[in-house]
Amino acid sequence: MNGRAGDQGSVSVELALLTPALLLLLSFAVVAGRTQVAEGAVAEAARAAAREASLARDDVTAAALAGAQADRTLAAQDLRCQSTSVDIDTTGFQAPPGQPGDVTVSITCVVGMADLLAPGLPGSVTVEASFTSPIDAYRER
């Protein structure tokens, strides 16, 4: 006979105790991954929007181009934000020709995490990025 008769069923108990902990750990890994992907996508959108705005001839056109470019880049990155805010600072266009100026684009994206259905995890994570691009100092504005 087997001397370990008292251990029968212990594997089932261990599995029942460890499964929720492993699922929670997996959920944390998914949250971290989503956050990293969102940070990269928002940073790329801010960079592309600032670059697009810096190529414009005036501040009104720059703001319109930057907003459209930010939307296109976020869509291309397949990032689904619950809410998105794009702030464009075009005061660099007020500098006279020959003086340096720049355009800054700041993007805030709220990424949903509620679909993970894990207790203790946030329902959403806010990701922010900002990028500044110089305006050609000698170009007519």
Predicted regions and their residues:
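Short, conserved structural patches
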Residues: 55, 59-141
